[in-house]
């Protein structure tokens, strides 16, 4: 980190997601700042960790489907599986703020309490027609698979640039068998990796999640919040920060920068921001004085997302994305701030479609429980094709679902069920609905799910025989198209993301999933929180030695031995 050390006393946060909220908490608690000196500008007040009644989202900036014909039910664009073992910065953050649903508990205690009473143990991780529940504990490696994966695990941090611009497909180009293993089916759907994704990022995951590699088939290392992540994590942060006097200004898009003119082209000082009102289109200029830090979340995986409903597919939104556009403008001025096009100009590598399904009774839920033989809250069920569907003429996962512990929302009624699912490759053709997933309505996605369940139904009877009753029980199913959902995994070089504290920056820091941090893997609340923590400590003058210590299981002999044994199961 080569940023110029300049302690500030005020901050402007561009983006109101987890990483910037974390930065604000650390500025207040460890930097001893006054909350009134922190101002957030964002298009919404939740970032990617959202979740709520459909009506809460219909008028948000990113929803282009107006008017929605059906606004009943709930929606969450995505979901998060936590891991206490590695998400140490997240748990430190949540221990600093009170829960909004459990009096007397911190948000971390709330999650630990719920998780201790509802431990994850998935017994139907992979399912396939003709086989039902697959014994996924057998990872299916051959010796070439083991050799190449071991090379990733043993590659030191200092050599990871050898994987600059190397995709997973390229890394395993002489070993197509890897993509036919139970390991790959589970890894791609647990973390949303694709064959086009970065081998460099896969290496980081193998290092930081090496302990979970040894028990991936049951997801026993997965920890979950009591409710959706908005109500269990983001809302407590908002309430705490508002109580500290922090200002949140939403429906605002930061459109452009004003930088100080300096003789050196890599000296970065923000002097002003051009901000547009997302509803009126009016713009204003906000001055940034010398005592103000600018902390910017440079890219969001939910940028340009769109919603459909039960009878309407989610439309494609071709926007580059508001946060990525602002990042791109910064890179046009300074050469050491990364390459946003690597992440936001290749939808073929980054897009997927999710859905949130709400029912008025538990008929559908009970059918899923019967077929998968496990209670809600344990599952990430992935349905493996019975015929080749990939460019390599191989089988792959058609779709995946998460059956939450109920209720998943605090306002959810006792008779209601909410479940979530996604299609990692949205342009593949449906098996039971003859169109690409991206073109499907919420009803058609439900029909596709019933079809996939019917292939693995052990009987007696079959869910397909009750298709009408199950469909009639659905009050809504909200498809969400996310063009950049896996953008953070896109093939890249290490230099394609700016450092949290860029060299020669006097007041600008980057946070979130598109900021480069040593060792940290992305698409995790861990990396998001840590980036905010680093930015906060820098601008508050807190020594970096005070950062939460990151465990290195990849350097623990016992864990490595356990992983080696797992490879030969």
UniProtKB/Swiss-Prot annotation:
**How would the record characterize activity across temperature?**
Optimum temperature is 42 degrees Celsius for the hydration of linoleic acid and 37 degrees Celsius for the dehydration of 10-hydroxy-cis-12-octadecenoic acid (HYA).
**Amino acids binding FAD:** 87, 254, 300, 524
Q: Which InterPro entries match?
A: FAD/NAD-bd_sf, Oleate_hydratase
> Per its UniProt entry, which superkingdom is the organism in?
Bacteria
Keywords attached to this Swiss-Prot or TrEMBL record, sorted alphabetically, are: Cell membrane, Cytoplasm, Detoxification, FAD, Fatty acid metabolism, Flavoprotein, Lipid metabolism, Lyase, Membrane
Q: A Pfam family matched by this chain, by name?
A: MCRA
pH effects:
Optimum pH is 5.5 for the hydration of linoleic acid and for the dehydration of 10-hydroxy-cis-12-octadecenoic acid (HYA).
- List its EC numbers: 4.2.1.-
Which GO cellular component term is one of those annotated? Answer: cytoplasm
Q: What does this protein do?
A: Is involved in a saturation metabolic pathway of polyunsaturated fatty acids, that detoxifies unsaturated fatty acids and generates hydroxy fatty acids, oxo fatty acids, conjugated fatty acids such as conjugated linoleic acids (CLAs), and partially saturated trans-fatty acids as intermediates. CLA-HY catalyzes the hydration and dehydration steps in the production of 10-hydroxy-cis-12-octadecenoate, trans-10,cis-12-CLA, cis-9,trans-11-CLA, trans-9,trans-11-CLA, oleate and trans-10-octadecenoate during linoleate metabolism.
Q: Which family does it belong to?
A: Belongs to the oleate hydratase family.
Kindly provide the name given to this protein in its UniProt entry: Linoleate hydratase
Species the sequence originates in: Lactiplantibacillus plantarum
Q: What is the lineage of its organism?
A: Bacteria, Bacillati, Bacillota, Bacilli, Lactobacillales
